[in-house]
């Protein structure tokens, strides 16, 4: 039984960590922290957990976190870096859901996250494992510092990884169009995330320099064995949960459909969570966010365009589960020797 502390447990991601870990048979949650709600019952902030826990929020501190064997950090970008060195030095396993340890290049934090100086702990950047289980499974075994990928990066990387791995990416950068629900803005959000502004919206934001580009390019470069650049534009849309990405990859030689199935199965054939959706019949012939909500499932698909030598790829995930808390727990399971799907065996709800 692993004793777990969730630091920053009052937000959407923290709430999902609580929901998942309360169902995990190998975990005891010993603390859930929140400055704003310290002393309050967890279920009063996360009403869906009523009747499942009597935990109360406590003031966050290193000393509190050190009571656990494992700490999940669900903190804003730029905050985890203040916690990780002390926790890591103390021997506690850390699963960081912020971006603070995702990028291997210390200087990248100046460009992509507007830090005033390069990352202060370059040694820890190299020790951190990028927590995408299908692509880093061996590295995750026994890992003590895991950087959980970003939500839109998760969908984009898994969607394009087979093409990068098997040499289909040309010198023309892939174009990725992403759509994300309002929960991606967090529990506090901004004025444009209020219902009256968000309803009916399809709105681009950070259309040419979104920070998730850095980790997408980092991972695709690793898989391809050469520098990969992408064009990436996200859109806020009128749903609460979910991310849908469409990739346009212009190739020198169009693969056959049989080849595409072979590439996807070679990379993901053993995955408990990835489904390849490309059906000739049925009501959902390609990936659809609607059929992954509340789960750690990734639905991937593709189509071929011989007119333009274009491979069109698709990915659908729940941004709060596979894009954050669920992927963190999946990585935790591998690192700690639990079954990979422990706590994550939810079947999607339909209709919804």
Swiss-Prot record:
Single GO MF descriptor: N-acetyl-gamma-aminoadipyl-phosphate reductase activity
Cell location: Cytoplasm
EC numbers on record: 1.2.1.103, 1.2.1.106
Keywords: Amino-acid biosynthesis, Arginine biosynthesis, Cytoplasm, Lysine biosynthesis, NADP, Oxidoreductase
GO cellular component: cytoplasm
Pfam families: Semialdhyde_dh, Semialdhyde_dhC_1
Primary location recorded for the protein, binned into one broad class: cytoplasm
Function, in words: Involved in both the arginine and lysine biosynthetic pathways.
Protein name: Putative [LysW]-L-2-aminoadipate/[LysW]-L-glutamate phosphate reductase
Name of the gene this protein is made from: lysY
């Amino acid at each position: 039984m692993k004793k777990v502390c969730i630091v920053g447990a009052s937000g959407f991601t923290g709430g999902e960590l609580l929901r998942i870990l309360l169902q995990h048979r190998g975990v005891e949650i010993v603390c859930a922290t929140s400055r704003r709600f310290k002393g309050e019952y967890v279920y009063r902030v996360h009403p869906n957990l009523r009747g499942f826990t009597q935990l109360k929020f406590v003031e966050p501190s290193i000393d509190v976190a050190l009571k656990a064997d494992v700490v999940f950090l669900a903190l804003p970008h730029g905050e985890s870096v203040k916690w990780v060195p002390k926790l890591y030095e103390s021997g506690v396993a850390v699963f960081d859901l912020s971006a603070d340890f995702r990028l291997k290049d210390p200087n990248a934090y100046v460009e992509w996250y507007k830090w005033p100086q390069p990352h202060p702990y370059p040694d820890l950047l190299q020790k951190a494992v990028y927590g995408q289980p299908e692509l880093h499974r061996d590295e995750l075994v026994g890992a003590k510092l895991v950087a959980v990928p970003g939500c839109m990066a998760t969908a984009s990387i898994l969607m394009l990884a087979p093409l990068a791995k098997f040499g289909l990416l040309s010198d023309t950068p892939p174009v990725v169009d992403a759509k994300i629900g309002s929960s991606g803005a967090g529990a506090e959000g901004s004025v444009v995330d209020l219902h009256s502004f968000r309803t009916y919206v399809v709105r681009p934001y950070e259309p040419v320099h979104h920070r998730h580009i850095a980790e997408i390019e980092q991972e695709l470069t690793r898989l391809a064995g050469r520098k990969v650049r992408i064009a990436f534009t996200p859109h806020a849309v009128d749903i609460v949960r979910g991310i849908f990405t469409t990739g346009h990859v212009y190739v020198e030689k169009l693969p056959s459909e049989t080849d595409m199935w072979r590439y996807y199965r070679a990379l993901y054939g053993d995955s408990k969570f990835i489904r390849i959706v490309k059906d000739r019949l049925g009501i959902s012939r390609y990936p659809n966010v609607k059929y992954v909500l509340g789960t750690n499932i990734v639905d991937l698909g593709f189509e071929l365009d011989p007119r333009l030598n274009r491979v069109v790829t698709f990915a659908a995930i729940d941004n709060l589960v596979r894009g954050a808390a669920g992927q963190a727990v999946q990585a935790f399971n591998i690192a700690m020797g639990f079954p990979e799907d422990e706590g994550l065996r939810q079947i999607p709800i339909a209709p919804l």
